Curated annotation (Swiss-Prot):
Protein name: PTS system glucose-specific EIIA component
Species assigned in the record: Salmonella typhimurium (strain LT2 / SGSC1412 / ATCC 700720)
Phosphohistidine modified-residue sites: H91
Entry keyword Metal-binding: yes
Site, Important for phospho-donor activity: residue positions: H76
Domain comment as written in the entry: The EIIA domain is phosphorylated by phospho-HPr on a histidyl residue. Then, it transfers the phosphoryl group to the EIIB domain.
Requisite cofactors: Zn(2+)
Active-site positions on this chain: H91
Null allele phenotype: In mutants defective in enzyme I and histidine-containing phosphate carrier protein (HPr), cells lacking this gene are able to grow on the non-PTS compounds such as glycerol, maltose, melibiose, mannose 6-phosphate, and alpha-glycerol phosphate.
Role according to the record: The phosphoenolpyruvate-dependent sugar phosphotransferase system (sugar PTS), a major carbohydrate active transport system, catalyzes the phosphorylation of incoming sugar substrates concomitantly with their translocation across the cell membrane. The enzyme II complex composed of PtsG and Crr is involved in glucose transport. It can also phosphorylate mannose, methyl alpha-glucoside and 2-deoxy-glucose. The non-phosphorylated EIII-Glc is an inhibitor for uptake of certain sugars such as maltose, melibiose, lactose, and glycerol.
Source organism phylogeny: Bacteria, Pseudomonadati, Pseudomonadota, Gammaproteobacteria, Enterobacterales
Subunit description: Heterodimer with glycerol kinase (glpk).
């Protein structure tokens, strides 16, 4: 890369030049600080850093282009690796594993290639609001050791559309 290429990349708005990766909302709702999740594993960032979403919709979608890693047997959580190497973990609610799959329906499969917005899991929000300890849904990056900068966004988000996190590797 020559001097002019370097200067051009510094002043360009093109995401490819700046190396910024956007994570899009895997579900609709309101962004909440990860530290406010009523589970120490997420609040203390033991499994990674990120945000949580107080959900308003009925589906979880792929937040990045990539490959579905694991979908829990109870369909309440999934992992995905982005094409750029970001490993994400989306976990609906707290203690939702105890519902043994009630209120969740798997749409995607493990190992499936997905694009941003492709449905992964559908859920019954009224049922889960009644039965789960919390519906706050952590969205965390599990390979934080590879991340240089993490910018957490805030506000209301629309599933498959609104960015929730910006990352520089």
């Amino acid at each position: 890369m020559g001097l002019f290429d370097k200067l051009k990349s510094l002043v360009s708005d093109d995401k490819k030049d700046t190396g910024t990766i956007e994570i899009v909302a895997p579900l609709s709702g309101e962004i909440v600080n990860i530290e406010d999740v009523p589970d120490v594993v997420f609040a203390e960032k033991i499994v990674g850093d990120g945000i949580a979403i107080k959900p308003t919709g009925n589906k979880m979608v792929a937040p990045v282009d990539g490959t579905i890693g694991k979908i829990f047997e109870t369909n309440h959580a999934f992992s995905i690796e982005s094409d750029s190497g970001i490993e994400l973990f989306v976990h609906f609610g707290i203690d939702t594993v105890e519902l043994k799959g009630e209120g969740f329906k798997r749409i995607a499969e493990e190992g499936q290639r997905v694009k941003v917005g492709d449905p992964v899991i559908e859920f019954d929000l009224p049922l889960l609001e009644e039965k789960a300890k919390s519906t706050l849904t952590p969205v965390v990056i599990s390979n934080m050791d590879e991340i240089k900068e993490l910018i957490k966004l805030s506000g209301s988000v629309t599933v498959g559309e609104t960015p929730v996190i910006r990352i520089k590797k």
